[in-house]
Amino acid sequence: MESQQLSNYPHISHGSACASVTSKEVHTNQDPLDVSASKIQEYDKASTKANSQQTTTPASSAVPENPHHASPQPASVPPPQNGPYPQQCMMTQNQANPSGWSFYGHPSMIPYTPYQMSPMYFPPGPQSQFPQYPSSVGTPLSTPSPESGNTFTDSSSADSDMTSTKKYVRPPPMLTSPNDFPNWVKTYIKFLQNSNLGGIIPTVNGKPVRPITDDELTFLYNAFQIFAPSQFLPTWVKDILSVDYTDIMKILSKSIEKMQSDTQEANDIVTLANLQYNGSTPADAFETKVTNIIDRLNNNGIHINNKVACQLIMRGLSGEYKFLRYTRHRHLNMTVAELFLDIHAIYEEQQGSRNSKPNYRRNPSDEKNDSRSYTNTTKPKVIARNPQKTNNSKSKTARAHNVSTSNNSPSTDNDSISKSTTEPIQLNNKHDLHLRPETY
């Protein structure tokens, strides 16, 4: 009879049967409050998890609060979705705390899909499709970038006023050492530029091109927090974050200043290695140039000792300064100041010798007068005349003139002339010399 009634009302009899069977099975002398500590911890964890998911369990007045009593479990409600992005990828309030940086130790906790633009630059909607990517985020700097052929699928939601490149943007690698931060921040800046955020990057004067919005600042902070773990940050970055843990713009500004300083250091090293001096410029200017370079390098942590500095300076000396390489090469403890004392001594000696030379500059008017009366005497022609050939070189007119005069002269003169050729010539001098015609 009782079984017939149960068969007529299967849903009621099933519940009654379950309740009766359950009550018989749990009917023991054990105190329901006597529960082990491990089970209490499990209950606490379950309740905490339920509170975090913001799910409520409806209270049932029909079922007593007995942990051993079987009661129907409520259906699990899936967490709400925020557009195309999964809920587990969104940052919570606890994770926004700086102490929660450890939650982002793995790339899968990134608050946006890897290799894509910031979520704020894509219109939300069910049409957007974001493919899954392998766990290659956080790879070293040498890892090749994704292939350029990987692009988003075309969608009707792409026609929007918002900016979209429809290309995967590779995020920066994971920072693994404080010494790698200068190289890492370069990839981080490149990542921001590829994400259409180049306008908010500080310029040389430390100010961005355009103001930054709150959403963009949140994106900067999240990306920096994920890929730059706090234990691998340099000391100066930790000092900035200790004042304001969201001041990523100040970190970028300081990083750009350090990049420019590194460029200046490289230029100073190249200049110091290629020094040249031959006395054409003042020694004071050369000394000031070299000492300023050495001081800048020492202040930036690149120490140049006296031995290395002297070798670099002496290698660039030429001319009269070249011998300093050989006179000073045995002095191991020579300083840069001592080397420049020798350079100054040679330079002053050169200047003194140039000033002591006489200056023979003539008046231009004198040069003009001399040019008028000057004859060409560069190579005067010296002619040696032979007396025997002199008489033979007379012209015919001179000979004819002599003949005519001899015919017109009296005979007495001719006789005296003929006699003078045979008689010796008497010289009235103290030596009493006689010249004969044959010896003349």
Curated annotation (Swiss-Prot):
<keyword id="KW-0963">Cytoplasm</keyword>
<dbReference type="Pfam" id="PF01021">
    <property type="entry name" value="TYA"/>
</dbReference>
<feature type="site" description="Cleavage; by Ty1 protease">
    <location>
        <begin position="401"/>
        <end position="402"/>
    </location>
</feature>
<protein>
    <recommendedName>
        <fullName>Transposon Ty1-BR Gag polyprotein</fullName>
    </recommendedName>
</protein>
<feature type="compositionally biased region" description="Low complexity">
    <location>
        <begin position="402"/>
        <end position="418"/>
    </location>
</feature>
<keyword id="KW-0814">Transposable element</keyword>
<comment type="function">
    <text>Capsid protein (CA) is the structural component of the virus-like particle (VLP), forming the shell that encapsulates the retrotransposons dimeric RNA genome. The particles are assembled from trimer-clustered units and there are holes in the capsid shells that allow for the diffusion of macromolecules. CA also has nucleocapsid-like chaperone activity, promoting primer tRNA(i)-Met annealing to the multipartite primer-binding site (PBS), dimerization of Ty1 RNA and initiation of reverse transcription.</text>
</comment>
<dbReference type="GO" id="GO:0005737">
    <property type="term" value="C:cytoplasm"/>
</dbReference>
<feature type="compositionally biased region" description="Polar residues">
    <location>
        <begin position="419"/>
        <end position="428"/>
    </location>
</feature>
<feature type="compositionally biased region" description="Polar residues">
    <location>
        <begin position="48"/>
        <end position="60"/>
    </location>
</feature>
<dbReference type="InterPro" id="IPR015820">
    <property type="entry name" value="TYA"/>
</dbReference>
<dbReference type="GO" id="GO:0075523">
    <property type="term" value="P:viral translational frameshifting"/>
</dbReference>
<keyword id="KW-0597">Phosphoprotein</keyword>
<feature type="region of interest" description="RNA-binding">
    <location>
        <begin position="299"/>
        <end position="401"/>
    </location>
</feature>
<comment type="subunit">
    <text>Homotrimer.</text>
</comment>
<feature type="compositionally biased region" description="Low complexity">
    <location>
        <begin position="153"/>
        <end position="165"/>
    </location>
</feature>
<feature type="region of interest" description="Disordered">
    <location>
        <begin position="1"/>
        <end position="93"/>
    </location>
</feature>
<feature type="compositionally biased region" description="Polar residues">
    <location>
        <begin position="127"/>
        <end position="152"/>
    </location>
</feature>
<dbReference type="GO" id="GO:0003723">
    <property type="term" value="F:RNA binding"/>
</dbReference>
<feature type="compositionally biased region" description="Basic and acidic residues">
    <location>
        <begin position="429"/>
        <end position="440"/>
    </location>
</feature>
<feature type="compositionally biased region" description="Polar residues">
    <location>
        <begin position="1"/>
        <end position="10"/>
    </location>
</feature>
<feature type="region of interest" description="Disordered">
    <location>
        <begin position="352"/>
        <end position="440"/>
    </location>
</feature>
<keyword id="KW-0694">RNA-binding</keyword>
<feature type="region of interest" description="Disordered">
    <location>
        <begin position="126"/>
        <end position="173"/>
    </location>
</feature>
<feature type="modified residue" description="Phosphoserine">
    <location>
        <position position="416"/>
    </location>
</feature>
